[in-house]
Amino acid sequence: MLLLPLLPVLLCVVSVSSSGSQTCEDTLKTCSVIACGRDGRDGPKGEKGEPGQGLRGLQGPPGKLGPPGSVGSPGSPGPKGQKGDHGDNRAIEEKLANMEAEIRILKSKLQLTNKLHAFSMGKKSGKKLFVTNHEKMPFSKVKSLCTELQGTVAIPRNAEENKAIQEVATGIAFLGITDEATEGQFMYVTGGRLTYSNWKKDEPNNHGSGEDCVIILDNGLWNDISCQASFKAVCEFPA
């Protein structure tokens, strides 16, 4: 009878005790599940912090150069400059004059060389060299040709030189002897009277007058002849 009034109190204690035990078990089970689960997602971004209070660090090394840029378009032309003063042409004109003079000398030497090449091999006698190109021409042209070649018309001053001229000419040729200044008085074209002669018999005879020049025949003898006639040119040079 005494226990009956206490029955509700006992039921409450058992109920609380049983509920507390279940809660602990649930708590253990819950903690076990959390420990075994994966990481959760990141939370929302926090607010920007305040600037730091430390010293500023050193500047870093420069970076690599970038690629060159594209070539720009040409700029607009600048203004035209003022007209300059006339140059001094005197020095240029002097140089041109000198060059022209040198060219004339070279041409003259070339012409001389070409004419010398036209002559056959000569014949040396003592200190003289006699040469011919075997061309026939009047005495005036023979004299001009030999002078242009810096020689003279062949003059035999002894029998040896006369023989050399005869062999070189291989035909009739003019000698550097005339009586143009005084008839009958034959002189060398270089000046002076004859010191040697080899006239053909009855020569010189001034046949028909006007035979003021001298030729050497095939046999080496001399004959007076008109200076307008044409015979071979033989020139002499110092050897």
From Swiss-Prot:
Residue ranges of the region described as Disordered: 35-88
Point out residues bearing the modification 4-hydroxyproline.
Answer: 44, 51, 62, 68, 74, 79
PTM annotation (5-hydroxylysine): residues: 45, 48, 80, 83
**Keyword Repeat applies:** yes
Chain intervals with Low complexity compositional bias? 58-74
Which GO MF term does the entry hold, naming one?
oligosaccharide binding
Q: Which InterPro entries match?
A: C-type_lectin-like, C-type_lectin-like/link_sf, C-type_lectin_CS, Ca-dependent_lectin, Collagen, Collectin_CTLD, CTDL_fold
- Region annotation (Calcium-dependent carbohydrate binding) ranges: 203-211
Record keywords: Calcium, Collagen, Complement activation lectin pathway, Complement pathway, Disulfide bond, Glycoprotein, Hydroxylation, Immunity, Innate immunity, Lectin, Mannose-binding, Metal-binding, Repeat, Secreted, Signal
Q: Where is the composition biased (Basic and acidic residues)?
A: 38-50
Q: Name one GO cellular component term.
A: extracellular space
Its localization reads: Secreted
- Tissue distribution: Detected in liver and blood serum (at protein level). Detected in liver.
The UniProt entry's GO biological process terms, in alphabetical order, are: complement activation, classical pathway; complement activation, lectin pathway; defense response to Gram-positive bacterium; killing by host of symbiont cells; positive regulation of phagocytosis; protein homotrimerization
Q: Which residues are in coiled coils?
A: none
| Glycosylated residues in this chain | 45, 48, 80, 83
Entry binding sites for Ca(2+) 1: 179, 183, 211-212
Q: Where is the signal peptide?
A: 1-18
| Record-annotated Collagen-like domain positions | 37-89
What does the entry's domain section say?
The helical collagen-like domains from three protein chains assemble into a coiled coil and mediate trimerization.
Q: How does it assemble?
A: Homotrimer. Forms higher oligomeric complexes formed by the association of two, three or more homotrimers. Oligomerization occurs in the endoplasmic reticulum. Interacts with MASP1 and MASP2.
Q: Under what name is this protein listed? A: Mannose-binding protein A
Q: Which gene encodes it?
A: Mbl1
